[in-house]
Amino acid sequence: MANILSLETLLISWLSSFILMFFILKWVSFYSKTKKNLPPSPQKLPIIGNFHQLGPNPHRSLQALSEKHGPIMLLHLGSVPMLVASNSEVAQEIMKTHDVSFASRPNSPILNILLYGCKDIAFAPSGEYWRQLKSIIVSNLLSSTQVKSFKNVREKEIGHMIGVIGESYGSSVDMSALLVSLAENVICTVALGRKFDGLKLTSLLRRYLSMFNLFSVGSYIPWLSWVDQLSGLTGRATKVVKEFDEFLEVIIEDHANAKINGGKDFIDMLLNAQQDQTTGFAFQRDTIKAVIFDIFGGGIDSVSTSIDWVMSELVKHPNVMKKLQKEVTEISQGRSMVAEEDLEKMQYLKAVIKESWRLHPPVPLLIPRKSTNDVKLMGYDIQAGTQVMVNVWQIGRDPTLWDEPNEFRPERFSKGSVNYSGLNFEWLPFGVGRRACPGTQFGAAVIELAIANIVYKFDLALPNGVKHEDLDMSEKYGITVHRKNPLLVTASPRF
């Protein structure tokens, strides 16, 4: 009996100590938070935090929240603190003033599966590995010289697309689908050395890319990560990566054994960099595959979506279309196709693309960054480990920066003061600083040449007598924000 009483006393003592410690820790946590000057936060719910306030179009929902809480907000997505920047001033503080502190990326169980433990360039955490890999990619794959070297690929695939559009005369053509095929063909050829026709690769690519659109519970509520297993998300991601890995392994092995000839592609360049002993940076095939995944994931959607929105705006604004056609026609001087060398002279073309990117940035919420240390940001205390999203869609429509911000007016860029390099914080569709997209120049080369040739060769209209002002511009959120419905047009040869 004495032993039982002793055990009960011990248990009561432990329980009392635990409860006391719990309340002490809660008090310390509360006191610590009250001493910090945190950014304004919308009311959150237990477990899910502010997820219920994001809706199907988070960039628009966050704009509405910022109108109430201000240009810098602290949300909680599950257990993840997420800072949201909604104007150019806050964006500049994050991506310039405190760029080093916000140069890392958050970790994610699903991204670890899709990108070999985030060994790619887009999602790798900041550090020596990321710096070395970025240097290799920028100097070997995406330099101006290399971008120019793929001119023949761009011309060939755009010429093929123009032929398909021409054959559609008398019926409507699905411009959106054509542009996805164009982007796939260009990027496959540049990355892998050849175009892989057939439904198998197309299906594999689209299944892989679709994984980035799916919500991973474990990424935001770690103790509920079993939900990803139960829902099949983890299994699906593992399966599609295994299929893609097997496909890429064959291609890489063929390159390594010189079975594929016909010029240097991205895999050749990465294999050469892997064998280069002078860099002092050793990496395995998983890195090569992760980089190729990046190129597919970041390139196909952003290129096709960018062109799709430009063509939509041109069809909706025939006066802009005519002005652009005039410029392209005068500079091309009767040639059968627009030459890439002439693109630099087409300043209105560049203005049209910039204006479309202002209204329709491919990624309206830049890939989240993560703070590596405590930061004092515009008077607020930001703790290490806080994730950061920049709403570039909202910045592009800020009425304090842009006159009539919802109107499509390319003339606002006619002076050429804003370039693709991302140094203007009122216009940053591809980010700025250490984490700016390194492939902007590569993508722009495809986008400019494709648009110039489409408007040079064809007059476009909406089918079935639909008026241009009635074109549906609804959007759908995904890897990129693309058209909700495909762009269907009729194309008439101009000459």
From Swiss-Prot:
Pfam families in alphabetical order: p450
Superkingdom of this protein's organism: Eukaryota
Binding positions (heme): C437
PROSITE patterns listed in its UniProt record: CYTOCHROME_P450 (PS00086)
Residues that carry a glycan: N419
Organism: Tanacetum parthenium
Taxon lineage: Eukaryota, Viridiplantae, Streptophyta, Embryophyta, Tracheophyta
InterPro entries: Cyt_P450, Cyt_P450_CS, Cyt_P450_E_grp-I, Cyt_P450_sf
UniProt name for this protein: Cytochrome P450 Tp4149
